[in-house]
């Protein structure tokens, strides 16, 4: 997902990430990457875009997505922006239904369409059309955007002047699967490549019959074939060489790739509250640390990294835990004057455990979940000594959250979305480095291979 890249202010790092992704694609013989997501995630209840989006501000989404796409294309990999004309403001998933986006043309132009327009103006190569019903853009056909000539041909290709390859989203998805002539309809709408049509043989037979009946012209088919062939040449497929698998894993997971990934995570962790400048911790000799991870059943990378800096007693709380053990774990926390709570779950049962663990205390809360989950914890946020958003529970996100607490890295991240009534997009406090951090040789300007 893009969640940890969207709170990074330095777009050159996102370009480097895209470039490294392009290098890895090329090494594996991949010519096309169905990224970046250009959807503006303005609906916190969105079940399918969410953390895949670069945020909820159209200009920010455009800037970061274009940086990533340019990085990809600098390595000869086609970027494919998606899901035109915008899947961000819906609470439904087009894998399972046909979402409806009910906004005016003016709203769509200023929000959903803006990143796509900037992407097209930047001269990038690929676009994916989404399975969405958008009455303001097409009130005549009642077709999803991916199958609508008004949206694909008239809007995308004529008005916005997109000249690259147009792909449909997967046609087997519920948002498009109910149309029996989906392949014919998609081609007539203006798409060039059809992804995963239902029963391809049947769809091909239908296209052959359509050619015989003049429902679609040979010229349209030939133009699309020539367009695909042109891009095959551009992407080097006229000089195809089999991929050598020797040393593949080592070359993919090289030190530079790790350096970029680590930089992305280090710059994304966001400090939202820091009462009394508690973070980074000082006077360690006066502190006793208890660190409970909630929503997991095994000791975490977060707890391991905390123990690299101080004597920290780890514990766990999770839904389904024996009541006696739950009570004992919560009671034990009162022994420590510094309580760190790592939050790994948005489940109701685990939220209640966090609230119980916080009662009567001034904890440091560290969230390894979506920022939208903060709403579920709003009752306990005022009592927290500090609040950190790490966005996900990958090992690096956990390790850098721990380093931030102890001053091994500086706090730089900015919240990429608005959390209604709590935090505004762009919020994020800064802290200095006060202790040594943990890094790879490449991050220190050295070469680990020497």
List each language-model region with its residue ranges.
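Short, small-residue-biased leader/transition segments that mark boundaries at the very start
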Residues: 3-4
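Glycine-rich anion/phosphate-binding loops
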Residues: 8-23, 58-63, 108-110
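Acidic-leg catalytic submotif of subtilisin-like serine proteases
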Residues: 20-34, 281, 290-291
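Short glycine-enriched loops at secondary-structure junctions
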Residues: 31-41, 81-87, 172-173, 200, ...
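Hydrophobic beta-strand scaffold residues
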Residues: 32, 79, 166, 363-364
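Flexible hinge/switch segments at interdomain interfaces of large molecular machines
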Residues: 34-43, 84-90, 237-245, 430-433
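Second-shell residues forming the walls of enzyme active-site clefts
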Residues: 56-220, 227
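Preference for extracellular/luminal or secreted protein segments
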Residues: 158, 179-447
């Amino acid at each position: 997902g893009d969640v940890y890249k969207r709170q990074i202010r330095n777009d050159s790092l996102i370009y480097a990430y895209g470039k490294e992704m392009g290098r890895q694609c090329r090494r594996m013989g991949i010519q096309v990457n169905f990224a970046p997501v250009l959807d503006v995630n303005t609906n916190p209840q969105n079940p399918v875009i969410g953390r895949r989006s670069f945020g909820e501000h159209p200009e920010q989404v455009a800037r970061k997505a274009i940086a990533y796409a340019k990085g990809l294309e600098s390595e000869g990999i086609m970027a494919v922006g998606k899901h035109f004309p915008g899947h961000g403001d819906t609470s439904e998933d087009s894998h399972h239904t046909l979402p409806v986006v009910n906004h005016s043309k003016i709203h769509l132009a200023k929000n959903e369409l803006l990143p796509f327009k900037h992407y097209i103006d930047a001269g990038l190569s690929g676009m994916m059309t989404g399975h969405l019903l958008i009455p303001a853009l097409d009130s005549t056909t009642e077709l999803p955007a991916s199958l609508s000539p008004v949206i694909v041909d008239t809007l995308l290709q004529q008005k916005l002047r997109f000249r690259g390859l147009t792909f449909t989203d997967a046609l087997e998805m519920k948002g498009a699967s109910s149309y029996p002539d989906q392949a014919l309809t998609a081609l007539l709408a203006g798409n060039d490549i059809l992804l995963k049509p239902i029963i391809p043989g049947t769809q091909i037979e239908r296209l052959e019959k359509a050619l015989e009946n003049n429902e679609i012209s040979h010229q349209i088919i030939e133009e699309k074939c020539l367009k695909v062939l042109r891009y095959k040449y551009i992407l080097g497929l006229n000089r195809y060489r089999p991929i050598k698998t020797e040393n593949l894993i080592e070359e993919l997971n090289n030190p530079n790739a790790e350096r970029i990934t680590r930089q992305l995570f280090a710059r994304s962790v966001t400090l939202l509250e820091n009462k009394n400048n508690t973070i980074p911790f000082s006077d360690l000799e006066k502190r006793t640390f208890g660190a409970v991870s909630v929503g997991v059943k095994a000791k975490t990378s977060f707890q391991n990294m905390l123990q690299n800096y101080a004597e920290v007693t780890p514990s766990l709380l999770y839904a389904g835990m024996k009541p006696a053990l739950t009570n004992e774990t919560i009671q034990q926390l009162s022994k420590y004057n510094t309580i760190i709570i790592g939050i790994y779950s948005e489940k109701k049962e685990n939220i209640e455990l966090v609230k119980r663990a916080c009662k009567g205390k001034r904890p440091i809360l560290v969230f390894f979940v979506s920022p939208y989950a903060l709403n579920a914890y709003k009752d306990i946020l005022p009592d927290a000594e500090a609040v950190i958003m790490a966005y996900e529970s990958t090992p690096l996100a956990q390790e850098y959250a721990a380093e931030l607490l102890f001053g091994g890295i500086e706090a730089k991240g900015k919240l990429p979305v608005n959390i209604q009534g709590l935090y505004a997009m762009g919020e994020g406090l800064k802290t200095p480095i006060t202790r040594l951090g943990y890094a790879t040789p490449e991050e220190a300007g050295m070469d680990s291979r020497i």
